[in-house]
Amino acid sequence: LALTLPHVAHMPALAAKLDVLLFDIQGVGSAWYPFQYSMSWALEACALAGIPFIVLDRPNPLGGRVVEGPLLDPRGIFRHALPLRHGMTYGELATMWNQTEGYGADLTVIRMQGWRRGMPWDDTGLLWVMPSPNMGTLETALVYPGQCLFERMNVSEGRGTTKPFLMVGAPWVDAEKAAADLNGRGIPGAVFRPAHFIPRIDAGSPNPRGKPLNQMC
């Protein structure tokens, strides 16, 4: 059962061949992350097919007490308007959408034991297992809600390096001056240092925003 946008039209027919659909995917607490919308499509498909949908809930790595950032425009892969940092677990999102969108699915959320809304990931005792290739560390998840804004610009957000979303740059950016300026702003919990990198991306990949690919940033 493919959970990516080009395949969503076929989800109800595919779901009709199943007895139950179990969703067990780690989220990162950000509206940018596509798997929560995949869950929404799958939830609706199960409702249309008349089969149960079960979510094995997991902690929100960013915690559940802070909600911040603008709402994403619900279009394309972003099916619902969520703030950049939404403060919810996938089980909570599924429960909300099942009601607000009127899916009416036979939804069961297997709740976690021991997790509290104010609990940072480090306090869960869980190991970080990368939920997708560009989400390799907890630090990546922490900066992702803000750093992903650079993905919509003509700069590199670090994809194609070993530290995606932990670096940003372009050939026309003075790394030393940028780091000095940002450090001078005294942003709590953030330290910036100059870095130079080459984002290695297939030259044939779509590049509608004119990002610097395979060149020094």
Stretches found by the model and what they are:
Residues 146-186:
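Oxyanion-binding "anion nests"
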Residues 74-147:
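Conserved anion/nucleotide-ligand pocket segment
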Residues 1-17, 30:
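Glycine-rich oxoanion-binding loops at beta->alpha junctions
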Residues 48-52:
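A short helix->loop->beta-strand "cap" motif at the edges of active sites that frequently abuts
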Residues 54-74:
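Glycine-rich, charge-decorated loop segments at or immediately adjacent to ligand/cofactor-binding or catalytic sites
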Residues 20-28, 54-57:
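Short acidic catalytic loops
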Residues 27-39:
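Glycine/threonine-rich flexible loop motifs
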Residues 169-217:
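Conserved functional hotspot residues or short segments at active or partner-binding sites
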